[in-house]
Amino acid sequence: MIDTKALINQFDEIKSRLAIKKVSEETLSALKDMALKYKSCKQELEELQAFQNKTSKLFGEYKREQKDITALKVALDENKVKMSTLESTLKEIESHLETLAYGIPNLPDDATPEGEDENDNVEIKKVLSPPHFDFVPKEHWELGIANGWIDFEAGVKLAKSRFSVLRGMGAKLNRALINFMLDYNEKAGFESIVTPVIVNARALFGTGQLPKFEEDMFKVDSHFCDEQSEHDLYLISTSEITLTNLYQDSIIPSEELPIMLTAQTPCFRKEAGSAGRDTRGMIRQHQFDKVELVAITHPTQSAAMQEKMVQTASEILSELKLPHRLMQLCGGDLGFSASNTIDIEVWLPGQNCYREISSISNTRDFQARRAKIRYKENGKNALVHTLNGSSLAVGRTLIAIMENYQQVDGSVMIPEVLQKYL
């Protein structure tokens, strides 16, 4: 959630920076007007509270001195009614303000290049050269079926399209990748966590999936919830949600920062906006495994932490000897919660192109403001910065291994670094 105080004081600058994310001036003006209304109402309420306190003190003095308290009593009663009415109004305004603010994306930071879409992203560097084949390389779905690693028909039979079943060596490699990634992340200083894969709406508001992206979330049937539950429940689309929200409504001593976490979970997405895209294979699934990195930092640490997270994910691909490149996303291609994002794209010979395998984002204080995550330093509280990124998407890493390690006879070699995990 953006800082509404900053919006009031720096409206033109924020309007300009959010224009690249297609936020209209009318939308921001409506938010600014509501923020000013909230500020005015709150100030008026504080004045009434100050009057109430001052008059109550005077009322006590008059009573002790046996002076006439009739006028003071009337003033206090009338002021109390005004306060009650204004408190209700303030709550209503606050609710409207939050509704508007929750729909506004994060500001691109100064290091994010200008641009409209993925075509304007900037390549930072390539790591490892793509392999040369003396034959036409196959796509992963052909290799997966031929080697008995992937059963797409079984996924459809058990669920629907965009689900698949891994078998034999496919399942073993999937497990090996998860263990390898978690081990590597731990060595880089990230603490392993196991979290639920079902969360309440409060958690999704905290990290920015709700309210804007509810159509892409799998919602748990209300019959699952007990009658006393006040929460809608959802399957997570990423463990960024659970890892970040472990610290919602927290005040963290500054000396405990940074907090660095990693987790592996299944992730669930409806892919509502992806009709017709990547319909074959495992590139875009409703359920997939992902190993995630999340960091909670002091504001001065977040840029360096993003570099560390990118380095960690890139090193995993290098250990697997998978060619990849780092891409700096332009403002128009940034996600809703991101202020700065570096994508890692892995080379897929069967598709003859690079495909995203990780997005590592610095959200600065955007999620922290929504989830109310603060740190205490020198007796004062301030918002932390939060970062998240895949390290890595397991299914896409498996795809990359199949395509980069394929042999002329259709078999697939196993990366040396994974062999001890099998």
Curated annotation (Swiss-Prot):
It comes from the Bacteria. Its main location: cytoplasm. The keyword Nucleotide-binding applies. Keywords: Aminoacyl-tRNA synthetase, ATP-binding, Cytoplasm, Ligase, Nucleotide-binding, Protein biosynthesis. Pfam families: Seryl_tRNA_N (PF02403), tRNA-synt_2b (PF00587). Pathway: Aminoacyl-tRNA biosynthesis; selenocysteinyl-tRNA(Sec) biosynthesis; L-seryl-tRNA(Sec) from L-serine and tRNA(Sec): step 1/1. L-serine binds at residues 238-240, 292, 390. InterPro entries: aa-tRNA-synt_IIb, aa-tRNA-synth_II, aa-tRNA-synth_II/BPL/LPL, Ser-tRNA-ligase_type_1, Ser-tRNA-synth_1_N, SerRS_1_N_sf, SerRS_core, tRNA-bd_arm. ATP binds at residues 269-271, 356-359. GO terms for biological process: selenocysteine biosynthetic process; seryl-tRNA aminoacylation. SUPFAM superfamilies: Class II aaRS and biotin synthetases, tRNA-binding arm. It is found in: Cytoplasm. One of its GO terms (molecular function) is ATP binding. It catalyses: tRNA(Ser) + L-serine + ATP = L-seryl-tRNA(Ser) + AMP + diphosphate + H(+); tRNA(Sec) + L-serine + ATP = L-seryl-tRNA(Sec) + AMP + diphosphate + H(+). Gene3D superfamilies: Bira Bifunctional Protein, Domain 2, Serine-tRNA synthetase, tRNA binding domain. Its EC number is 6.1.1.11. Signal peptide: none annotated. GO terms for cellular component: cytoplasm. Belongs to the class-II aminoacyl-tRNA synthetase family. Type-1 seryl-tRNA synthetase subfamily. NCBIfam families: serS. Homodimer. The tRNA molecule binds across the dimer. Consists of two distinct domains, a catalytic core and a N-terminal extension that is involved in tRNA binding. Catalyzes the attachment of serine to tRNA(Ser). Is also able to aminoacylate tRNA(Sec) with serine, to form the misacylated tRNA L-seryl-tRNA(Sec), which will be further converted into selenocysteinyl-tRNA(Sec). This is Serine--tRNA ligase.
